[in-house]
């Protein structure tokens, strides 16, 4: 599980991971299960979330992309 903290108006990007065949269908991308996002807590304007996703998907902070 990847754990990220985000503030109001900050984003995450979920996209095919580097090296994944671009011709893969959605069914193939999600063959190992769905994306699961769990809110783990928050303080003020910040929330901590845990994200589980198939290895074919990359999860990145938008400010890093």
Regions found by a protein language model. Give the residues of each.
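Compact, glycine-rich, soluble single-domain proteins
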Residues: 1-65
């Amino acid at each position: 599980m990847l754990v990220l903290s985000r503030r109001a108006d900050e984003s995450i990007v979920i996209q095919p991971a580097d090296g994944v065949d671009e011709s893969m269908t959605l069914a193939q991308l999600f063959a190992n299960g769905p994306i699961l996002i769990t809110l783990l807590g928050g303080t003020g304007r910040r929330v901590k979330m845990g994200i589980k996703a198939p290895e074919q998907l990359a999860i990145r902070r938008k400010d890093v992309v």
